[in-house]
């Protein structure tokens, strides 16, 4: 923000907005804690998207509001908008088809299957950094074009749903038949802080494709959605871009066919914009002056809009009918020979040297130009595997249409989780493997059935530790980002989850529970696994002198192996699970940061994380049966001993390994080793925020509160994937 232009005309009034010396007195100004301690634990990540930031209040029900929507009228308004060209941002060829497709694509395209974060599900394109990414130039205009429609329909349609629906309507208006549309994306009201966009400090910093396979990053350069369209690091080489394309689309869960279909389909309509050098382009929306009102990238070149627009710096039109669906992308790709050239802005692109002028100008009907392509478009011709698929689509346009329809639906719905979350009249009936489909329920256990099942579990010989551990193993795969994982489906009993090291308890416990399920035939295995946790916790609470009934909602089903994509479910295997004192790799962040990461995926607050760790430690749920963090002389009792002993100054802690991952607590007087611990344990005494929470549960009057809080947090985790209850 410019202090000369944006301080309420202070120069004209003669008043300075600050005291002499220029000190900023506003809240949050000045040197912050993270400036002093940049490695400070990000406990604040667990405070995101609370009711304090939500203007609609905790009683707002989006599904209920959506049911009041005149869906046909909304689509009609979107269709009319496509050709309602506005002078402040004129439409290419009189149509916003390409712009809205790009908006939807770039909203959904931030999704990464490796950690489930990103994607279009929360409408994050409204906020920084995405609203100001170099790859999202001019999408601020697309969102402003949509505002009158959003204003008209209000809370009956979320921004997140509207962005994707606008892209769908644009495709349909071009003559393309989409696969369907599922609404249900709920808006949030602040930027996601948990998404790791990378460590780079400068936009468009290049990353090697191999690095993408090791980190949850979706693009080859900071600030891009996928790959650099000029080739890796502006190389201009189509073949060298193949690895980058596979890495980025692969991180979204796309195979080669889906990748080719998405690139070609996305480039069948619309154009890129590079009328002049980027030096004409002003600040992005987040850095623009206050009078810009959230719009950015104002251009000083000519009119700055229409034929003078600068977006990517590339000036490419792929097809002869850029507002109507066709197979011209593949026809042009293989029909002509391509030579490297540069756009008016100086960006590397390719032109069909032997083609006539067959491409219409977007604003002057009397003008034509030669077909042009991006460097990465030609990758689909020159990479051997991509070329096979591209030629098949060239010769079979219907196969291309079907592949793109399905890939587009996957792109725009991948982060929504199971189909149970979809709402609206255009939800496809077909179940797709990437939706983690579930069968219809076979059981409807009565209250009497549940009582009998609990008795059978209690009499099975399983320990409290085993019962609680197996329930946690089943439910804790849930990821709040893409709503995958969780206890529903009992996929703990299927590959790959049953073979994960962290789930070693399953080999001992599942046969017992499977026998109970088979013998009683009253409930699904998924329900029985969760019910085992209920039995274990109730027994542990009773042993602590607290009688409590753990809430249990039956209705889970058992997935089949053929409904489970092993490769995609393998991505849910935790690198670390601090709740079970599990850490598979030491080369990825710190143990305590990974604990925060896991808690954030489980949508837990800091108090919920704290009470769960403390309770699970005294119940002996470490994945390997170790005594690390088991700060109690009475394991299996749901006590506050973890907190009381951790904060007890009688004990002094010292590391026992070179990596500072393992510790022992010795009596300060005798030197005797009393307890052992990991970083996931000691962080509740070392971090000031977590220590403050631990102190609550370490107090002498906290026991009953602790049990109640533990049960509430536990039930929350068990029901995270019960979208039928939400």
UniProtKB/Swiss-Prot annotation:
There is a cross-link at residues 226-252 (Tryptophyl-tyrosyl-methioninium (Tyr-Met) (with W-105)). Binds 1 heme b (iron(II)-protoporphyrin IX) group per dimer. Its EC number is 1.11.1.21. Residues 1-33 are annotated as: Disordered. Heme b binds at residue 267. GO terms for cellular component: cytosol. InterPro entries: Catalase_peroxidase (IPR000763), Haem_peroxidase (IPR002016), Haem_peroxidase_sf (IPR010255), Peroxidases_AS (IPR019794), Peroxidases_heam-ligand_BS (IPR019793). It is an enzyme of class 1 (oxidoreductase). It holds the Pfam family peroxidase. The active site is at residue 106. Its cofactor is heme b. Keywords: Heme, Hydrogen peroxide, Iron, Metal-binding, Oxidoreductase, Peroxidase. There is a cross-link at residues 105-226 (Tryptophyl-tyrosyl-methioninium (Trp-Tyr) (with M-252)). GO terms for molecular function: catalase activity; heme binding; metal ion binding. Bifunctional enzyme with both catalase and broad-spectrum peroxidase activity. NCBIfam families: cat_per_HPI (TIGR00198), PRK15061.1 (NF011635). Homotetramer. Belongs to the peroxidase family. Peroxidase/catalase subfamily. This is Catalase-peroxidase.
